[in-house]
């Protein structure tokens, strides 16, 4: 990899790490009631794993993504410099400024939605199966591996669909909490 491409990847990974830190890390994701509820609903709706979640993902999520990006852009464009300063002073229980937490929450909402649609496209792809079948030949073991892969991606995908829906509530809660913040006293 050339130097400029390597630098761009390092910057990209660094920004993702910063977002994840401000969001609360993987522990925050896996401990989230929204994620847990999404996982439970996915297990209860085994039929979705087959392929129904793909249709849901590709029909629901793009509209939600447009709404998310629009809300994110509008919210951050109307916040005044004074309010941004105040939001940097208000910290959550982990010591992360509320402005960074709010930003990370909206980014997480968008990131999960994009991931959901991406997984749906990968789930429906057949190129890898076709290439391996051509190289190795038809094999029941190969078919078993691909069946297991489709079940796993179906579970992941349906969980992401539910999680994307529930994250709309999380984003609304951030905006609601923003309205309840009291400006800190001058020092």
Regions found by a protein language model. Give the residues of each.
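N-terminal juxtamembrane cytosolic/stromal segments of multi-pass membrane proteins
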Residues: 1-40
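Loop-to-transmembrane boundary segments
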Residues: 23-33, 95-118
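Hydrophobic alpha-helical membrane-embedded segments
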Residues: 59-78
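Membrane-helix interface/capping segments
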Residues: 74-94
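Alpha-helical transmembrane segments and their membrane-interface junctions
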Residues: 111-133
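Membrane-interfacial helical/loop segments at transmembrane boundaries in membrane proteins
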Residues: 127-146
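Alpha-helical membrane-embedded segments
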Residues: 148-177
């Amino acid at each position: 990899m050339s130097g400029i491409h390597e630098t761009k990847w390092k910057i990209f990974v660094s920004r993702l790490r910063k977002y994840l830190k401000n969001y609360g890390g993987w522990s925050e994701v896996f401990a989230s009631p929204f994620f847990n509820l999404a996982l439970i609903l996915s297990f209860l709706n085994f039929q979705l794993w087959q392929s129904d979640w793909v249709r849901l993902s590709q029909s629901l999520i793009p509209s939600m993504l447009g709404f998310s990006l629009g809300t994110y852009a509008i919210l951050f464009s109307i916040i005044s410099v004074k309010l941004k300063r105040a939001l940097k002073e208000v910290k959550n229980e982990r010591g992360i400024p509320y402005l960074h937490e709010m930003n990370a929450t909206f980014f997480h909402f968008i990131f999960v939605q994009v991931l959901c649609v991406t997984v749906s496209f990968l789930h429906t792809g057949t190129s890898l199966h076709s290439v391996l079948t051509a190289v190795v030949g038809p094999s029941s073991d190969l078919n078993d591996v691909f069946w297991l892969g489709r079940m796993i991606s179906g579970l992941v995908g349906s969980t992401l669909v539910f999680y994307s829906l529930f994250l709309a509530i999380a984003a609304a809660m951030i905006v609601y909490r923003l309205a309840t913040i009291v400006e800190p006293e001058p020092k």
